[in-house]
From Swiss-Prot:
Belongs to the aconitase/IPM isomerase family. LeuC type 1 subfamily. InterPro entries: 3-IsopropMal_deHydase_lsu, Acnase/IPM_dHydase_lsu_aba_1/3, Acoase/IPM_deHydtase_lsu_aba, Aconitase_4Fe-4S_BS, Aconitase_4Fe-4S_dom, IPM_dehydratase_rel_enz, IPMI_cat. [4Fe-4S] cluster binds at C351, C414, C417. Its EC number is 4.2.1.33. Keywords: 4Fe-4S, Amino-acid biosynthesis, Branched-chain amino acid biosynthesis, Iron, Iron-sulfur, Leucine biosynthesis, Lyase, Metal-binding. NCBIfam families: leuC, PRK05478.1, PRK12466.1. Heterodimer of LeuC and LeuD. Binds 1 [4Fe-4S] cluster per subunit. One of its GO terms (molecular function) is 3-isopropylmalate dehydratase activity. It catalyses: (2R,3S)-3-isopropylmalate = (2S)-2-isopropylmalate. Its cofactor is [4Fe-4S] cluster. Pfam families: Aconitase (PF00330). This is 3-isopropylmalate dehydratase large subunit.
């Protein structure tokens, strides 16, 4: 549909997927790709059976086992009876409804938001949904991707559509280039630190600027992955040659002339020069330093060369009270140097930072410590995001770099990102984690989570505390 009014990328994606927009009703959008897993799909399948409905387009749905599985064993019951029941249910449901499943031990199994891109299931210009809040990851490709609830999972199963109200638009521009050693995780944590944990509520965010354009696809995924952590419905990055090169040749991606024509279309998938956004935020890349969260939401973050803030540093009474609560839960004292905070657990993994580039970066830091071992009082685990990532890392010898230094090398899965499997922290454990959420109890009851980059996590494992790698 052509229009004389300049449009944002989000508005273009919305318009091309709009099925119905009846006055007084919630608009209806077409869904191109539906990713499912064992946790948010059982009730949706049960309702389909109750109403005797088929999955309308099973070929547009892909299932994987990721949240509840053990990363120590491929046995379906290794993470407990409850998890095993959900995993068995997924296998039965996929068979009954004709949905392709990457189950335990399958060469394509992995975290949904890792396997989608690496297999070419994630494509620019599409709408992608999943019953998981970090579906925004796929926005790195210029796809409108967002998490949905179980009732919405059922709606997509039955109709391949979804009712959605149109969001507001926000542009976040990161000007210039980041300094040496600054990662994509640092960029997104710095953004969240500036906006606060609810700063983009009600918006779809488009990331742009030289610092964003310079990122690899895997780094862009890290940025978009955490869009929900400051309230955004979704995060978008305009597709470019970096995107096209990444997608080309992937197993499920278009091939030959079909791919070439797709690229022609994808090149137009960007915000028009004069498009108006409802909100604009600008950051200077050179000001971004390595980040560490100190509190109990991702917005409570500071550079590693800083100190734990005091409640008196906040003028807003809500933020002041939040700081008091966070310091109490985290067992921290205001004024403590971030580099003086010691950890006893390290987790490198999750849909935020478990791809091959993340593992290479972490291994590179381990090598810089020239034979030093993980501190004896620390348990450190490396969890690749998929079997393909695992195999690639092993072919490069990364697993040996980690295990020789005292890290555990695990099987793919969501693992310690969330307390939903057998990788759970105990009360009082303090973890340097490459995941995306540091809420109270997120990694286990009473657990204390500090969100960091893979590089920072690896350094913390070797030294026992947070390190300013650029000092």
């Amino acid at each position: 549909m052509t229009t004389s009014t300049p449009q944002t990328m989000y508005e273009k994606l919305w318009q091309t997927h709009l099925v119905e927009a009846t006055k007084g009703e919630t608009p209806l959008l077409y869904v191109d790709r539906h990713l499912i897993h064992e946790v948010t799909s059982p009730q949706a399948f049960a309702n389909l059976r109750f109403h005797n409905r088929p999955v309308r387009h099973p070929e547009r749905t892909i299932a994987t086992m990721d949240h509840n599985i053990s990363t120590r064993s491929i046995k379906i019951d290794a993470a407990g009876e409850g998890a095993a029941n959900q995993l068995r249910a997924l296998a039965i449901n996929c068979k009954d409804f004709g949905i392709e499943l990457f189950d335990m031990g399958h060469k394509n199994q992995g975290i949904a938001h890792v396997i989608g891109p690496e297999l070419g299931l994630t494509l620019p210009g599409t709408i992608i949904v999943c019953g998981d809040s970090h579906t925004a990851t796929h926005g790195a490709f210029g796809a409108l991707a967002f998490g949905i609830g179980t009732s919405e999972v059922e709606h997509v199963f039955a109709t391949q559509t979804l009712r959605q109200n149109k969001a507001k638009t926000m542009k976040i521009e990161v000007k210039g280039h980041v300094g040496a050693g600054i990662s994509a995780k640092d960029i997104i944590l710095a953004i969240i630190g500036k906006t606060g944990s609810a700063g983009a509520t009600g918006y779809v965010v488009e990331y742009c600027g030289e610092a964003i354009e310079a990122l690899s696809m895997e780094e862009r995924m890290t940025v978009c992955n955490m869009s929900i952590e400051f309230g955004a419905k979704a995060g978008l990055i305009a597709p470019d040659q970096t995107t096209f090169d990444y997608v080309e040749g992937k197993e499920y991606a278009p091939k030959g002339e079909v791919f070439e024509q797709a690229v022609v279309d994808w090149k137009n998938l960007k915000s028009d020069a004069d498009a108006q956004f409802d909100a604009v935020l600008t950051l200077d890349a050179k000001d971004i330093k390595a980040q560490v969260t100190w509190g109990t939401n991702p917005g409570q973050v500071i550079s590693v060369d800083g100190t734990v803030p005091s409640p008196e540093d906040f003028s807003d009474p809500v933020e002041k009270e939040s700081c008091v609560s966070a310091l109490n839960y985290m067992g921290l004292t205001a004024g403590t140097k971030m580099t003086d905070i010691h950890v006893n657990k390290v987790f490198i993994g999750s849909c935020t930072n478990s791809r091959i580039e993340d593992l290479r970066a972490a291994a590179g830091v381990v090598q810089k410590y020239e034979g030093q071992q993980v501190v004896k009082t620390i348990d450190a685990i490396i969890v690749p995001g998929s079997y393909r990532v695992k195999e690639q890392a092993e072919s490069e010898g990364l697993d040996k770099i980690f295990t020789d230094a005292g890290f555990e090398w695990r099987l793919p899965g969501c693992s310690m990102c969330l307390g939903m499997n057998d990788d759970v922290l105990e009360e009082g454990d303090r973890c340097a984690s490459t995941s995306n959420r540091n809420f109270e109890g997120r990694q286990g009851r009473g657990s204390r989570t500090h969100l960091v980059s893979p590089e920072m996590a690896a350094a913390a494992a070797i030294t026992g505390h947070f390190v300013d790698l650029n000092a």
